[in-house]
Amino acid sequence: GGTWVSNVGLHTGKSPLVQLAPEHPICRGWTEYELFDEYYLHPTIGDEATPVLEVTANGEPVIVGWAYERPMSEGFAGGRAFGTTLGHFYKNFQREPFRRMVVNAILWTAGRDVPAGGADVALSEADLALPPKPAEAN
């Protein structure tokens, strides 16, 4: 659904994370919210992909999440994919709407049902207090 192209431009800052396809299962259970992340400015997304998420960077709309559903055809079982350029900062994963978007995308991609209210992504205070880097290997 998307292609990596070097030197696409980069912007780090805050922007509302907007649902371009609110009816898509990835968008269930969360609404637009302010997100601080690193945004790639000119992503290359396939014509068949569905833009799902957008931010505004440097005053311009930027697609930061897209979905692709490959149709079933003779000899091919089809399949789903979700791509995003988000997720550069640990603090975003501490936010429930961000986690819900990611887990919804995983469920949808795996062909699982996404609940109407979105995936359950509740964490305890202890979970949220975990350090942002993995523990040293023994």
Placement of each model-derived feature along the sequence:
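Extracellular ligand-binding/catalytic regions of CAZymes and related secreted enzymes
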Residues: G59-V62, P71-N138
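An acidic, glycine-rich "communication" segment
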Residues: G1-G59, G118-N138
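Extracellular/periplasmic catalytic domains that process cell-envelope and extracellular macromolecules
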Residues: Q19, T44-G46, Y68-A77
